[in-house]
């Protein structure tokens, strides 16, 4: 985002702690719905394949469309937050997610499903970005990782819905009811944000320390300046792989893997998805509190990424029922380390670039999800055509992409000085 946000972040009008937490929780309700929307495919996959005859590759495109729309909108949402503020940006964008869910519930073909995913992705695009900007503005810098971890944990409640509850709903009715219920919940979240979130007057562009807000051209050039810094590439290459690995498993492949490999029912696979989501609720807050600081944080990020790659590789090598349950649970526990990436981004750039850096980083996270879900869909379809076990190939693909991300982060230039 543009420099006015950075100035407002440094000198916003104060909120009391109860006010700040109440507003953050309202914003997190939108993030929770975003979490739910991005993890529906694992539970809806069998119903969608049965009704529309989707291949594994088409299923990967369906799941990745949300992430692609979400990711490509991050820069635009960042600019919107600068110029119009957190509240107005989210209130204008989020109704598109409601419309997309409603459209998906009545979809008559694959193209309508994809359009619904685009609308949902665009509508949810500012959901977590507004939370990180709000935390940067109204909480102390020393608490950024811990508060972000808590927000990610609470927002993860959305993934609990897309476990056992959604599996039961889909099994008792259809996947269409799943989209319908999510549309209703999203409308309630929008109403809560409208009611609770009120930004102080000086919290966005035009009322901050700059008398005149930046032009659009200046803002775009400001984003370009990020890529002139050599350490940006390594940060973004790791960002493309980490969250994508967790979401490709939880949001796309977990249900089909358990059903096809081990004969699980839809509700039984939903139980595993719920358990994975449950442990992932607490993991970000734990890792946020354990943040070792700039001196050690990058080594932790590399090490945990390699460990995550090893878990996926193990699920590819040993096709055992207990491992295919324990592995996702372990991934859910370890996924909390990704909150340290936000702290790493915040400490890797000067204050005037922090907002822009967060926008670009979040964009990379979700473009990575779209990329990995598409690549693993292609890998699964190719493996099936060649007579190979598709889920082993999917797990190896994810492991390899994680290893590449860790290598890039480790060997490409690091920030000269972190703050």
Language-model segments: which ranges?
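Helix-to-loop junctions at the C-terminal end of transmembrane segments
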Residues: 73-85, 283-296, 380
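Helix-loop-helix hairpin linking two adjacent transmembrane segments in secondary transporters
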Residues: 150-202
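Helix-breaking motifs and short loop linkers at transmembrane-helix boundaries and internal kinks
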Residues: 53, 85, 106-112, 123, ...
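Juxtamembrane intracellular "pre-TM" segments in multi-pass secondary transporters
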Residues: 8-16, 200-236
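Cytoplasmic membrane-interface "Motif A"-like loop-to-helix N-cap segments
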Residues: 83-94, 292-305
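Extracytoplasmic gate region of multi-pass secondary transporters
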Residues: 41-42, 229-284, 372-377
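Cytoplasmic helix-loop-helix junction between adjacent transmembrane helices
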Residues: 116-155
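Conserved MFS/SLC helix-loop-helix module at the cytosolic interface between two early adjacent transmembrane helices
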Residues: 72-111
């Amino acid at each position: 985002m543009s420099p006015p946000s950075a100035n407002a972040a440094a000198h916003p009008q104060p909120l009391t702690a109860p006010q700040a937490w109440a507003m953050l929780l309202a914003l997190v309700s939108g993030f929770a719905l975003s979490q739910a929307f991005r993890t529906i495919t694992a539970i809806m996959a069998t119903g969608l394949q049965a009704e529309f005859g989707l291949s594994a590759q088409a299923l990967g495109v369906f799941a990745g469309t949300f992430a692609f729309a979400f990711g490509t909108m991050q820069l635009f949402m960042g600019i919107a937050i600068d110029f119009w503020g957190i509240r107005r940006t989210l209130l204008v964008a989020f109704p598109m997610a409601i419309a997309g869910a409603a459209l998906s519930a009545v979809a008559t073909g694959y193209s309508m499903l994809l359009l619904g995913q685009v609308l949902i992705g665009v509508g949810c695009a500012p959901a977590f970005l507004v939370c990180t900007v709000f935390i940067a503005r109204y909480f102390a810098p020393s608490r950024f990782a811990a508060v972000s971890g808590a927000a990610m944990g609470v927002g993860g409640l959305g993934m609990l819905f897309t476990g056992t509850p959604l599996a039961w709903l889909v099994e008792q009715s259809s996947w269409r009811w799943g989209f319908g219920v999510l549309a209703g919940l999203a409308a309630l979240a929008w109403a809560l944000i409208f009611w609770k979130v009120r930004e102080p007057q000086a919290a966005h562009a035009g009322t901050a320390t700059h008398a005149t807000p930046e032009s659009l051209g200046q803002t775009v050039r400001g984003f370009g300046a990020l890529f002139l810094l050599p350490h940006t590439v390594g940060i973004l290459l790791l960002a493309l792989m980490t969250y994508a690995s967790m979401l490709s498993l939880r949001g796309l492949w977990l249900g089909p893997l358990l059903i096809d490999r081990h004969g699980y029912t839809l509700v039984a696979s939903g139980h595993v998805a719920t358990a994975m989501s449950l442990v992932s609720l607490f993991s970000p807050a734990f890792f946020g509190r354990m943040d070792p600081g700039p001196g050690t944080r990058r080594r932790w990020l590399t090490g945990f990424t390699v460990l995550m790659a090893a878990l996926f590789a193990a699920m590819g090598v040993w096709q055992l029922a207990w491992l295919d349950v324990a592995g996702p649970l372990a991934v859910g526990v370890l996924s909390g380390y990704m909150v340290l990436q936000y702290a790493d981004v915040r400490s890797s750039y000067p204050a005037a670039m922090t907002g822009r850096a967060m926008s670009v980083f979040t964009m990379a996270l979700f473009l990575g999800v779209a990329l990995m879900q598409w690549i693993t869909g292609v890998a699964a379809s190719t493996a099936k055509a060649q007579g190979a076990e598709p889920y082993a190939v999917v797990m190896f693909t994810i492991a390899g992409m994680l290893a590449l991300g860790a290598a890039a982060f480790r060997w490409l230039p690091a920030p000269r000085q972190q703050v």
